[in-house]
Swiss-Prot record:
The modification Phosphothreonine is found at T589. It comes from Drosophila melanogaster (Fruit fly). It is an enzyme of class 2 (transferase). Expressed in ovaries (at protein level). Expressed in indirect flight muscle (IFM) (at protein level). This is Nucleosomal histone kinase 1. It catalyses: L-seryl-[protein] + ATP = O-phospho-L-seryl-[protein] + ADP + H(+); L-threonyl-[protein] + ATP = O-phospho-L-threonyl-[protein] + ADP + H(+). GO terms for cellular component: chromatin; cytoplasm; M band; nucleolus; nucleus; sarcomere; Z disc. The modification Phosphoserine is found at S376, S381, S382, S388, S390, S483, S564, S586.
Length: 599
């Protein structure tokens, strides 16, 4: 790498003054160049200066065009002669980034494009009486910083992997010429401007480019901590330029582009380079666990493979670029993202687990409103689930029900939509037939599950005459059990009568009448909305004692109470083999037994 000649030893006093003078000029900002100024390069080419399009750490960048042309398709980077970075960058371009050499590398490796910029011209010019050095390069588009800011400091996963492949191509080109870049970051990666240019990213700013070491590892205090502190490598912290250091810098950037925050940034150590160095050493010494901390939901496989590989490289070992690229290429295939076309920087909306059955993007408020409309829980027959109901709730439901026409459940209902609750039941694994849900204390409204799209047959049972029964029992612990046998028959007005035929002999003249709707299928749970309807004739009637002794005692003790019943609902799918009393039972017929007892 070119070095500035040392002052002669004969004048030591002058040496000190000269050193101080040089230090005062080091990295001085350039003079402002007026728009329309013409620069003449070493090859006598003339370039018209356009508007300023950016200011770097030590120089300013202007749009430019050849004199006589109108398209500002080039840029001029201008710095005072005393500045070092542009001097290094210019000589790197002149020696290693000729357009012919770039094309030859692309042809050798079968590349359609390479993110390696090249120099168009260079020269010196006086601006406001001060000598400046300038270089002319092709003009590129926006840098990645713009997209990171737009997307909340992250990039789409597929785009990150494509950028990794493209930067590895540039690294391979530079390393093949004996140089390392040492300062890869989002601000130094630009997109192309020409037709199809958005498909290729270009690595720029070679102000820290230098020859990498191939011999012994010798730290250089003068070069310690060179680079951008967030991303500079462990070797660069010691002042040693290596090829593995370039890959390590790339890895830190990839982690950040995927939305994770580097530990030394989180810990706010950037103002103290030695602490950053120690944090990076600890991070790379146990890279597997370190990455798990940054990606608690799972480390992206290509990132894990790449960083583990980098951590095992020796300081003078040539990286296996093909192996590194293959990890990112495989990830792109799994994501079904092609490694061509324009780079996509639009973040896709992340889909939730959708546990509340709301579509992606549904607001929480809208989901809450929909949840209030869902009244029927998915029942767990293995657990004694209790569903509370109050008299006020029933009166409100009766009033709202009078305004609507009850929908009749017919066995031949077809093309019906599946209710949200049905979806929850279907999504559960076979071994877990039902999911327990806790009741809400708020008033519940009726849900309306639709009929199954497949026809189902129900046994025809002759209507049984109803006789006066005892006054309606309203006990606080009354429960309703649904278990294996049921006979259904339809009635006008959307009513269905459920007859208990669990015992060999039907209970004489005993029926329960409910307003409810069923949604039954071969592989789904039964969802039942039950509403108790008060009848005047039942309030004064006497009950028929056809229950077991335990249930009779429970009823006797609960007859004095006036609170609303608490229901316990147990459901299970029918195996399709009914008894002789129900010869017409279909496998799709729900099985329900209705009981009341004190819990």
């Amino acid at each position: 790498m070119p070095r500035v000649a040392k002052p002669k030893a004969a004048a030591p006093a002058k040496k000190v003054v000269s050193a101080k003078k040089a230090k005062s000029k080091l990295y001085k900002m350039p003079e402002k160049v007026k728009e329309g100024t013409v620069f003449t390069d070493l090859a006598k080419g003339q370039w018209r200066i356009g508007p300023s399009i950016g200011v770097g750490g030590f120089g300013e960048i202007y749009a430019a065009c050849k004199v006589g042309e109108k398209n500002y398709d080039a840029v001029v980077k201008c710095e005072p002669h005393g500045n070092g970075p542009l001097f290094v960058e210019m000589h790197f371009y002149l020696r290693n980034a000729k357009l012919e050499d770039i094309k030859q590398f692309m042809q050798k490796h079968g590349l359609k494009s390479l993110g390696m910029p090249y120099i168009l011209a260079n020269g010196s010019v006086e601006v406001n009486g001060e000598k400046h050095r300038f270089i002319v390069m092709p003009r590129y588009g926006s840098d990645l910083t713009k997209f990171l800011e737009q997307n909340g400091k992250r990039l789409p996963e597929g785009t990150v992997y494509r950028l990794a492949i493209q930067m590895l191509d540039v690294y391979q080109y530079m390393h093949s010429n004996g140089y390392v870049h040492a300062d890869l970051k989002a601000a130094n990666i630009l997109l192309g401007l020409e037709k199809g240019g958005a498909a290729q990213a270009y690595l720029v700013d070679f102000g820290l480019a230098s020859h990498f070491v191939t011999g012994d590892f010798k730290p250089d205090p003068k070069k310690m901590h060179n680079g951008t502190i967030e991303y500079t490598s462990r070797d660069a912290h010691l002042g040693v330029p290596t090829r593995r250091a370039d890959l390590e810098i790339l890895g830190y950037n990839l982690i950040e582009w995927l939305g994770a925050e580097l530990p030394w940034v989180t810990q706010k150590l950037l103002a103290v380079p030695p602490k950053v160095q120690k944090a990076k050493e600890a991070f790379m010494d146990n890279i597997g666990e370190s990455l798990k901390t940054l990606f608690p939901k799972g480390v992206p496989p290509p990132i894990g493979d790449f960083m583990k590989y980098v951590s095992k490289l020796t300081h003078n070992q040539e990286p296996d670029y093909d192996k590194c690229r293959s990890w990112f290429s495989s990830a792109l295939k799994q994501l079904k993202i092609p490694n061509n076309g324009d780079l996509d920087f639009k973040m896709k909306p992340q889909t939730s687990s959708n546990n509340n059955l709301s579509p992606p993007g549904t607001s929480k408020a809208a989901t809450a409103r929909k949840a209030k409309k869902i009244d029927s829980p998915v029942l767990n027959s293995s657990l004694d689930e209790k569903i509370s109901a109050s008299e006020d709730d029933e009166e409100e439901e009766e009033k709202s029900h009078r305004k609507k026409t009850a929908k009749k459940v017919t066995p031949s209902a077809r093309n019906a939509k599946v209710s949200p609750l049905k979806r929850v039941a279907d999504s559960s694994p076979p071994s877990q037939k039902r999911v327990k849900t806790e009741p809400k204390s708020t008033p519940r409204e009726r849900a309306t599950p639709k009929a199954s799209p497949k026809p189902r047959s129900t046994p025809k049972a002759s209507p049984k005459p109803q006789t006066p029964t005892a006054a309606r029992l309203r006990t606080p612990n009354a429960k309703i059990n649904f278990s294996p046998s049921i006979s259904l028959r339809g009635r006008p007005g959307g009513k269905t009568v459920i007859n208990d035929d669990l015992t060999p002999q039907p209970r004489s003249k005993k029926t329960y009448e409910f307003n409810f709707e069923l949604d039954v299928s071969m592989d789904a749970n039964v969802i039942v909305n039950v509403k108790r309807k008060k009848k005047a004739d039942q309030d004064k009637a006497t009950a028929v004692d056809s229950r077991t002794p335990s249930s009779r005692s429970a009823l006797a003790s609960s007859s004095k109470e006036e609170a609303s019943p608490v229901t316990r609902v147990n459901l299970r799918k029918v195996n399709g083999h009914g008894d002789s009393s129900t010869p017409g039972r279909s496998p799709r017929t729900p099985a329900v037994t209705v009981r009341k007892y004190q819990g």
